Amino acid sequence: MFRAAAAGPYDEAINKATDENLTSEDWGAIMEVCDRVATDANGAKEAVNSMIKRLAHRNANVQLYTLEVANALSQNCGKNMHRELSSRAFTDALLKLANDRNTHTQVKAKILERMKEWSDMFKSDSDLGIMYDAYYRLKQSNPTLQPPSAPQKNVLTDADRQKEEEELQMALQLSLQEEERKKRPAGASGATASSSSGGAAAGPSNAGGAVASGEGTNSTAGQAEATPQPVPSSTTAATVSRVRALYDFVPSEPGELEFKKGDVIAVLKSVYKDWWSGSLKGKTGIFPLNYVEKLADPTPEELQREAQMEAEVFAEIKNVEKLLTLLSAGNTGPREEDNEEISKLYHQTLAIRPKLIKLIEKYSQKKDDFTQLNEKFIKARRDYEALLESSMSHPPGPTYHQYAMRPPMTNSYGSGGYGAPPPQQQQEPPRFYNPAPAQDAPQYPATSPSPNPNHFIRPAGTPAPYYMGGAEGPGQLQHQQQPPYPQQQPQPAYGAPSRPQDQQRNPSGPSPMAPAPLNTTSSPPPGNQYTPYQAPGASGANNRTNSYSSTNGGAPQELSTSAYDSPIAQHSTNPLSNPSYNAPSAPSYSQGRPGAPTDDPYGPTSPGAGSSNNVGSAPPPPSGPAPSGPAPSAPSAPSAPSAPGAPNSYTQGAYHSQNPYAAAAAAAAAAASRTHVPGVYDGAGSEVSSTAPQPPAALQPGGGAQPQYKAYVPPGAPSAPGSGQEGPSAPGQNDGLADYYRSAY
């Protein structure tokens, strides 16, 4: 009478994707169905007809897999599939299955969930409104299928926090009491043990509202599974450690915890009044209390019963192994007695199957918990190692001590001028030859210092070069090793009183920058300042100084002069023509130069004793009358330097001053015989030739320029060779006289 429905083209593929023996969704088979439907014009209608047949199956797993296939087709097969899913035939099949009382609760909840998703997906198309109507009718007829709405996130008040703290203290107190009861002797009476058990069971009842007793444990647990009760709002997180999810929860805001029905969540703390913070599968977030139920901590009786059940299951392991051996080792035909034993062992194994499933679930959950704990531990260890490595790779830098900065060293005298005391400052220890210490004597102040920035000042603590006995002194050797630089010496103004030879300045005194004291016999009149003469191209040689040896202990003495003396010969001048502003009886500080006419402003005022360059004291001037002969109209030239080892240069100078013509001939011969002075260097480090007269440089220790005197140049006289312009000249220069005049001090 009844014909079986004709098999559709998609029945086999959909039956494979919704097989009742599957343990999970077969996504390979599901995607194969989606590919076939997407390429077939009539595939959407045929696939929906095949799914309606599978929804009529009585197995809940087949129904759940069919709903999953329908959801995959709706997301991958376009609008044609949307139209078939919103058809009257498919929606009626869904409503019929959901309203059947024999349908599993999970299947009903899944139907409601999928219909809601499809309603939201099809709401933009008015032709697909049948799905929304079917969803609205199902929600009205089955209000319990829909999960409750999440409560509002009300902030905890001070009273709520105080209550939570009180419950926490109560729970801690009960826990301590339980520990004390466990530590009591084992020989306690049974009444005491029973009362302790009753108190332990009553503790959670007072704290969290969970009712549990030693006799009705199984019945209470069974009722809890049948009708789960949400966590009451009066319960706090202080007394609850675990909760089980009653519904699926999808987060709607960041920070919320997603979970499925049946998940066990570890409670951490209270965040809002009806929201707690928990941890699940390595994730932390907040969840609503009306979606979960409280899990009471197991009592000692429950723990003992669970351990007994595990022992019974493990005792049956040998029967399971024996059954497997009989089933796998029988190569020949089964005997009758073996069949009886196999049947007996099989029934014994079936008896422990429910207990075995519970143990599998328990240890599977423990395995997941330990896996999550291991992951957290590994992450924490990696973070610690990373922090440790970063701290070791960037050690703190060494601490450096701050040293006091050396005060700046000045290279010139202060503004006090000649004779001003040097500034008291810390100086670097000298690294050169130090002559004999200077004599202590009062210093003579300068008459009128005037700064001149065009000249350099010799740094403090550096000895001036000098010559001693025809050999270079340490100062000159030092200048050969280091780069040469101009040095200057103080020069007194014109007409300054002279000082004796035995009180000349010593550069090795305690204050090397201080000038030597002067012994004066009369107060000097205000002297006139004159601009020093400088010839171009001779700036390097103008800054050279010379020093002489004195008879005071044989120590080398520094004597400033504007002329370059030969290291092997000493100049000598006529003491009679040596000019000085002082009286003839006063000792002269400056070197003498030949006399000049009285109308010459640079000429001498009175004959004075000239200072000599010879080793020893200067001889007294001749007391005889002046030599006869015509008076020269120009200053006579100084005598040429004598050859090395000259016995007495003073007598030669005196003889030439008395015989002008003999002096000119001797000077010409001496100039022709010498070409340069060895050991004498200019500012650039090259030797200075003595054939060209070098004008003196203005030397100023205190910043003021001291007067220099230009030699008289007769009209029409040629300039000095190499100077570039007219320089100092003297009678007889055309005859070969190459010396120059020393400036008077």
From Swiss-Prot:
CDD domains: GAT_Hse1 (cd21386), SH3_GRB2_like_C (cd11805), VHS_HSE1 (cd16978)
Bias type Polar residues, positions: 518-532, 540-576, 648-660
This protein's record includes keyword Metal-binding: no
Subcellular location: Endosome membrane
Gene3D superfamilies given in the database record: 1.20.5.1940, 1.25.40.90, SH3 Domains (2.30.30.40)
Protein name: Class E vacuolar protein-sorting machinery protein hse1
Region (Disordered): 142-237, 390-745
GO molecular function, one term: ubiquitin binding
Domain SH3 as annotated: residue spans: 238-297
Subunit structure: Component of the ESCRT-0 complex composed of hse1 and vps27.
Keyword set, alphabetical order: Endosome, Membrane, Protein transport, SH3 domain, Transport
Signal peptide annotation: none
Protein's job: Component of the ESCRT-0 complex which is the sorting receptor for ubiquitinated cargo proteins at the multivesicular body (MVB).
Biased composition (Low complexity): 186-214, 425-446, 577-590, 636-647, 662-672, 719-733
An annotated GO cellular component: endosome membrane
Biased composition (Pro residues): 618-635
VHS domain boundaries: 17-146
Stored SUPFAM superfamilies: ENTH/VHS domain, SH3-domain
Family that this chain belongs to: Belongs to the STAM family.
Protein's GO biological process: protein transport to vacuole involved in ubiquitin-dependent protein catabolic process via the multivesicular body sorting pathway
Gene name for this UniProt entry: hse1
Superkingdom assignment: Eukaryota
A Pfam family hit: SH3_1
Family matches, as PROSITE patterns: SH3 (PS50002), UIM (PS50330), VHS (PS50179)
Major site of localization recorded for this protein: membrane
Chain ranges of the UIM domain: 163-182
Membrane topology: Peripheral membrane protein
